[in-house]
């Protein structure tokens, strides 16, 4: 069936709305956020996100079936896009209402992660390893920041991101909590329960003392270099190593139990 096209030029108000949504204040007030790129837009649509408007070139339009589109030229699209090389589409989606937090399985928690690229990568990490719940302190970067959305490569559409007073949640949490530090137990010799929370801290300062005080244990990725001079790992890289180790051990255990 043909797509339902709308053919008209972009107005100043349309351009302004997309530009304003780069600011957290306007995203919070409107409940909207911007997604760029064909792949990501399609994934948000398939995940059931409500699209307020999709600006698409004619080369992209056939991929979206019955979605209501605003067909634009590549020149117009470049006015909307923040990318150096705009990718066929820019969409405005409505932020979903989050469900309650399910306290089971491996949960990743972020304590004041500031860099949008790191947050987007950690969201992709959760998606890759099947972690459905990502907890963020209220000081952590906004997951609907266009840079975070772009870095997540569509994975934000499949991961439940919850913002909350992290310490307050951990006080009442029924799961054991492990914080990643530079002076914890060796990650590779630690046995983790199937259900637990792993906390990653701020890029410069690590996990806050308030959150660290609530942990059941602290873990660290040991350095293997002879000189032992590397100061630290990027938080997204560290998160990948930790989650991969935990999931790998769990996979080995399930295979042994077969």
How would you describe each model-predicted region?
Residues 37, 114-122, 230-236:
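Amphipathic alpha-helical repeat scaffolds
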Residues 1-8, 252-258:
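N-terminal amphipathic/basic-hydrophobic helices that include classical n-h-c signal peptides
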Residues 2-58, 140-141:
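Boundary-proximal intrinsically disordered activation/regulatory segments immediately upstream
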Residues 179-229:
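Active-site/ligand-binding-proximal alpha/beta "capping" segment
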Residues 128-129, 143-155, 212-258:
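Structured adenosyl-cofactor binding patch, chiefly the S-adenosyl-L-methionine
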Residues 46, 100-183:
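RNA substrate-binding interface of SAM-dependent RNA methyltransferases
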Residues 64-75, 105, 176-177, 191-197, ...:
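Active-site regions of enzymes building and remodeling cell-envelope glycoconjugates
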Residues 69-94:
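Glycine/small-residue-rich loop that forms an oxyanion/phosphate-binding "nest" at active or ligand-binding sites
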């Amino acid at each position: 069936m043909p797509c339902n096209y709308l053919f008209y030029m972009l107005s100043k108000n349309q351009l302004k709305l997309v530009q304003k949504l780069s600011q957290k204040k306007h995203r919070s007030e409107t409940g909207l956020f911007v997604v760029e790129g064909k792949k990501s837009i399609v994934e948000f649509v398939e995940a059931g996100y409500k699209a307020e408007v999709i600006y698409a070139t004619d080369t992209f339009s056939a991929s979206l079936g019955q979605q209501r589109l605003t067909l634009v030229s590549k020149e117009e699209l470049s006015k909307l896009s923040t990318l150096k090389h705009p990718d066929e589409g820019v969409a405005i989606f409505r932020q979903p209402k989050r469900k309650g937090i399910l306290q089971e399985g491996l949960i990743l928690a972020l304590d004041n992660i500031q860099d949008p690229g790191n947050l987007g990568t950690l969201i992709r990490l959760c998606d890759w390893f099947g972690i459905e719940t990502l907890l963020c302190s209220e000081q952590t970067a906004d997951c609907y920041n266009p840079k975070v959305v772009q870095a997540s490569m569509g994975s934000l559409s499949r991961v439940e991101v919850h913002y909350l007073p992290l310490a307050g949640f951990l006080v009442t949490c029924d799961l054991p909590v492990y914080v990643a530090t530079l002076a914890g137990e060796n990650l590779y010799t630690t046995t983790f329960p199937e259900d637990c929370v792993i906390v990653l801290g701020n890029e410069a300062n690590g996990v806050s003392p308030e959150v660290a005080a609530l942990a059941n244990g602290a873990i660290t990725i040991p350095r293997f270099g002879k000189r032992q001079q590397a100061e630290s790992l990027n938080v997204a890289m560290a998160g990948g190593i930790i989650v991969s180790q935990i999931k790998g051990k769990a996979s080995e255990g399930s295979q042994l139990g077969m």
